[in-house]
Amino acid sequence: MTHSPIQYRLIKKEKHTGARLGEIITPHGVFPTPMFMPVGTQATVKTQSPEELKEMKAGIILANTYHLWLRPGDDLVARAGGLHKFMNWDQPILTDSGGFQVYSLAEKRNITEEGVTFKNHLNGARMFLTPEKAISIQNNLGSDIMMSFDECPQFYQPYDYVKASIERTSRWAERGLKAHRRPQDQGLFGIVQGAGFEDLRRQSTADLVSMDFPGYSIGGLAVGESHEEMNAVLDFTTPLLPENKPRYLMGVGAPDSLIDGVIRGVDMFDCVLPTRIARNGTCMTSRGRLVVKNAQYAEDFTPLDHDCDCYTCQNYTRAYIRHLIKADETFGLRLTSYHNLYFLLNLMEKIRQAIMDDNILEFREDFIEKYGYGRSERNF
């Protein structure tokens, strides 16, 4: 393989766990790890400007291959000079392969060795996505980090189905590597699958590591399994991945899952969670989730989170934000989205410091106790 445009630099290992502090070097800059990546599905992180994302120290964002292929089209993005120019973002971008959306959004899917035929969710047109096409789209988009086309089987699928699926995903990964036109300035990651089966995760990992990708993703989690089941898969999967390459846990954004993923050696995470729940008036705070649109906050003139120094918490009250959301004002969604993204990015900063201080287990215990996992919303 040619020299990879994506390099991982290990800075420090935490003494008591698998957590590691590092940085990832890309053609559009360097970002620290562990890192949470805000999701910009349609080439925008919903309601946020690039300047606001930089303000909250989002070192890298994610864009969605499936959605951008359907609209506005990857050829148009290429003519615009690639995603970075198209959306005015000069820092790293990661694109997914489109596979997860094909399996979760599209109708009437038919999976064969060649690829996946489906009806697109916008207009019902018949579409055909292959490993080569997924790579071609991402080459046009021009992201720094690309994903191989994979199948994401449901966590509780039968063993024989998952075995056939991971073997096909490995063949697809090899086809994607061969189709990659820009290995000099775009790094392609392989995606480990295998549901909850340890031997299949091992087989999938061995297949992909033998292909020498610049980085590896752990897929097929956060799809309905329990928190304990996710941790168990990470316990036996992450140690199999090369120490000198980035490790990316796909689709995970709950605070406890971020901390537990880091403890098990994961470097990168993404999820739509912070912006999706923000649009329903749900805010993550140091004391747990707060549903600001609830009536109890109508005359609450305090910030969303007393321990947060984000723009929203420094300038606006729960009562005002509740009013905006009840009145269907976009500014309310902007304020809650900003806060939730800031909360997770700030959490990752604290996690990085805990790795430096070799006390991530104590940090986890303190965070979980304050956040109040297992209790319903209370007054605070």
Swiss-Prot record:
Gene Ontology molecular functions? metal ion binding; tRNA-guanosine(34) queuine transglycosylase activity
- Tagged with keyword Disulfide bond: no
**Binding-site list for substrate:** D96, S97, G98, G99, F100, D150, Q193, G220
Locate the active site: D96 (proton acceptor), D270 (nucleophile)
Pfam entry (one)? TGT
| Record region (RNA binding) | 251-257, 275-279
Disulfide links within the chain: none
Residues of the signal sequence?
A: none
At which positions is Zn(2+) bound? C308, C310, C313, H339
Q: What is its EC number?
A: 2.4.2.29
Relate the assembly described in the record.
Homodimer. Within each dimer, one monomer is responsible for RNA recognition and catalysis, while the other monomer binds to the replacement base PreQ1.
What protein name does the entry list? Answer: Queuine tRNA-ribosyltransferase
Q: Where does this protein come from, organism-wise?
A: Streptococcus mutans serotype c (strain ATCC 700610 / UA159)
UniProt gene name? tgt
